[in-house]
């Protein structure tokens, strides 16, 4: 069964492929099929994930899954939230997508640290919402949620991962997300929690 991932993020594809390895599905990015990214005009993760999944399913003519995720910082009223990926406004280099993403990630992290200067409350959560559709007009989307709680560091730690991983410290594990091996992140992350729920939903409703 082919399922289109409504994202062109190569690192997210690798992470989700690892998480969904137990299912008899072929997960491919929409970019590999020539599908442009959908608009994300909504104020909640679930609405944006649904919009992205519906767009990918309509363009590909098959099942689709979308992840809308982000960082929600308590002291900032939940920001950056749904705009986590583009929190900072930057001029991106005319280079490949991964190089652009690295520049954007660095700018986002710098802005977050600036907004939290002098703030004692560093509590935050990584939030992931996964939405899967059998087709674009599927009236019964599968929806799964994951939340990973931690604290924002004063400076980046670690070289692995992407996005805000170097700033997100997990007290229970004693290190930042960017200091974790990929296997550990795949077990513990917000996306892993959502994926486990989605695996159960797919088995029960799509693959039974």
UniProtKB/Swiss-Prot annotation:
The keyword Magnesium applies. Its cofactor is Mg(2+). GO terms for biological process: nucleotide metabolic process; purine nucleoside triphosphate catabolic process. Substrate binds at residues 7-12, 69, 162-165, 185, 190-191. It catalyses: XTP + H2O = XMP + diphosphate + H(+); dITP + H2O = dIMP + diphosphate + H(+); ITP + H2O = IMP + diphosphate + H(+). Pfam families: Ham1p_like (PF01725). Binds 1 Mg(2+) ion per subunit. Its EC number is 3.6.1.66. Mg(2+) binds at residues 39, 68. GO terms for cellular component: cytosol. InterPro entries: dITP/XTP_pyrophosphatase, ITPase-like_fam, RdgB/HAM1. Homodimer. Belongs to the HAM1 NTPase family. Pyrophosphatase that catalyzes the hydrolysis of nucleoside triphosphates to their monophosphate derivatives, with a high preference for the non-canonical purine nucleotides XTP (xanthosine triphosphate), dITP (deoxyinosine triphosphate) and ITP. Seems to function as a house-cleaning enzyme that removes non-canonical purine nucleotides from the nucleotide pool, thus preventing their incorporation into DNA/RNA and avoiding chromosomal lesions. This is dITP/XTP pyrophosphatase. It comes from Methylibium petroleiphilum (strain ATCC BAA-1232 / LMG 22953 / PM1). The lineage of its organism: Bacteria, Pseudomonadati, Pseudomonadota, Betaproteobacteria, Burkholderiales.
